[in-house]
């Protein structure tokens, strides 16, 4: 039980830090970044660096088109996953290659991939920061959705 309480507290702490950092980042240097991710390795308590991430947009026939891909930086982040023009109203999927990530660390994970599927920009253009907390056998995710800056109008 103590393990789960510790994990819950760690999750709250990390996600609250991701939230505050995302708020400042989007309002400053990355004001034109409509989609970014922040991934944390809960086993080691550090950012999940070198994690491959793909962004897909759902078509009308429910198939998926790859929009972009990237790898998290040393701080566990990827900025500019989509341009303002690409990131229109629709359903999107972020695919995190978790098995590849954990295998490189010598661990055998449960999940091949972690997919985060969400609807974007259905209430007007917004900026999205998705935070993901990973372990080899679990994940948790949250999002910060911020309003458009005047520069985007």
Curated annotation (Swiss-Prot):
GO terms for biological process: purine nucleobase metabolic process; thyroid hormone transport. Its main location: secreted. L-thyroxine binds at residues 38, 77, 140. Residues 1-24 form the signal peptide. GO terms for molecular function: hormone activity; identical protein binding; thyroid hormone binding. It comes from the Eukaryota. InterPro entries: Thyroxine_BS, Transthyretin/HIU_hydrolase, Transthyretin/HIU_hydrolase_d, Transthyretin/HIU_hydrolase_sf, Transthyretin_CS. The modification Sulfocysteine is found at residue 33. SUPFAM superfamilies: Transthyretin (synonym: prealbumin). Homotetramer. Dimer of dimers. In the homotetramer, subunits assemble around a central channel that can accommodate two ligand molecules. Interacts with RBP4. PANTHER family: TRANSTHYRETIN, URICASE AND TRANSTHYRETIN-RELATED. Thyroid hormone-binding protein, with a much higher binding affinity for triiodothyronine (T3) than for thyroxine (T4). Probably transports triiodothyronine from the bloodstream to the brain. This is Transthyretin. It comes from Aquarana catesbeiana (American bullfrog).
């Amino acid at each position: 039980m103590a393990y789960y309480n510790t994990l819950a507290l760690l999750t709250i702490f990390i996600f609250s830090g991701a939230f505050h950092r995302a708020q400042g980042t989007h309002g400053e240097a990355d004001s034109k970044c409509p989609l970014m991710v922040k991934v944390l390795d809960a086993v080691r308590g550090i950012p999940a660096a070198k994690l491959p991430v793909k962004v897909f947009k759902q078509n009308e026939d429910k198939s998926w088109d790859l929009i972009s891909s990237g790898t998290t930086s040393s701080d566990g982040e990827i900025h500019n996953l989509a341009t303002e023009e690409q990131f229109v109203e629709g359903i999107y999927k972020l695919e995190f290659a978790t098995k590849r990530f954990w295998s490189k660390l010598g661990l055998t994970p449960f999940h091949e991939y972690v997919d985060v599927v969400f609807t974007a920009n259905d209430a007007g253009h917004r900026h999205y920061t998705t935070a993901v907390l990973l372990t080899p056998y679990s994940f948790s995710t949250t999002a910060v959705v911020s309003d458009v800056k005047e520069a985007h109008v």
